[in-house]
Swiss-Prot record:
GO terms for biological process: cell wall organization; isoprenoid biosynthetic process; poly(ribitol phosphate) teichoic acid biosynthetic process. Keywords: Cell wall biogenesis/degradation, Nucleotidyltransferase, Teichoic acid biosynthesis, Transferase. GO terms for molecular function: 2-C-methyl-D-erythritol 4-phosphate cytidylyltransferase activity; D-ribitol-5-phosphate cytidylyltransferase activity. InterPro entries: IspD/TarI, IspD/TarI_cytidylyltransf_bact, ISPD_synthase_CS, Nucleotide-diphossugar_trans, TarI. The record marks 14, 22 as: Transition state stabilizer. Its EC number is 2.7.7.40. It comes from Streptococcus pneumoniae serotype 19F (strain G54). Signal peptide: none annotated. This is Ribitol-5-phosphate cytidylyltransferase. The gene is tarI. Pathway: Cell wall biogenesis; poly(ribitol phosphate) teichoic acid biosynthesis. CTP binds at residues 7-10, 82-88, 113. The lineage of its organism: Bacteria, Bacillati, Bacillota, Bacilli, Lactobacillales. It holds the Pfam family IspD. Catalyzes the transfer of the cytidylyl group of CTP to D-ribitol 5-phosphate. It is an enzyme of class 2 (transferase).
């Protein structure tokens, strides 16, 4: 089975324009989270869309699904997320297992709730690549020169941009593989390895690159929200 896991566990309101976490802010005529879920609803191979939300916001998320996506609510599960990204993925996979016991072939397409401009092509590419690889990471080529500084004051290295990519989401992998690899980490490793695909890389697994889009914006600042609103208006 193919599942989607939407990471919507953040509670930050640092934009300073609302008491709502950013995934619940309005973008056009509906919340950012709803825009994101809608993209996954369009992919018929996805059995269930599991949304990991902070415990304080579960009922709010359920109300939004009832209001904006009543025809698809049977395909959507709202569950309590974890304290960080990887524990939220773990909670999402546990919710999948509760819905239907996991098999070794079950795949989850994980995605940031605040990336509402994901395309159907990106979702399908992730699913296709995950059939033949241990994991998939969605990326775009780095367009800016990236500099490295070990002390925050002086440049210590300028890597070759031709070899660099900017990570986005989705990140896709088999549910059981993630649970096994995450479970094998020490507490210290869990603190350091906050990116799911990095766990696969560190453990020597095959992580394929899926082509992202520069429009696959992650809305984390007021400027991001302004850009996103402009993109919605143009559409």
């Amino acid at each position: 089975m193919i599942y989607a896991g939407i990471l919507a566990g953040g509670t930050g309101t640092r934009m300073g324009i609302s008491n709502l976490p950013k995934q619940f802010l309005e973008l056009g005529d509906r919340p950012i989270l709803i825009h994101t879920i809608e993209k996954f609803v369009l992919e018929p191979s996805i059995e269930k869309i599991v949304v990991g939300v902070h415990g304080d916001w579960v009922s709010h998320a359920e109300d939004l699904v009832d209001k904006y996506l009543p025809l698809y609510k049977e395909r959507i599960i709202i569950t309590k997320g974890g304290a960080d990204r990887n524990t939220s993925i773990k909670k999402i996979i546990e919710a999948i297992d509760a819905y239907r016991p996991l098999t070794p072939e079950d795949i989850v397409v994980t995605h940031d709730s605040v990336r509402p401009f994901i395309t159907l092509r990106m979702i399908q590419d992730n699913i296709q690549l995950a059939q033949n690889h241990d994991a998939v990471d969605t990326v775009v080529e780095a367009v800016d020169t990236i500099v490295e500084s070990t002390n925050g004051q002086f440049i210590t290295d300028i890597p070759n941009r031709a070899h660099l990519y900017q990570g986005q989401t989705p990140q896709t992998f088999r549910c059981k593989d993630f649970m096994d690899l995450y479970g094998s980490l020490s507490d210290e490793e869990k603190e350091i390895l906050t990116d799911a695909c990095k766990i696969f890389v560190i453990k020597g697994k095959d992580v394929a690159l899926a082509k992202g889009e520069y429009s696959n914006l992650k809305i984390t600042t007021v400027t991001d929200l302004k850009i996103a609103k402009s993109m919605i208006e143009k559409d």
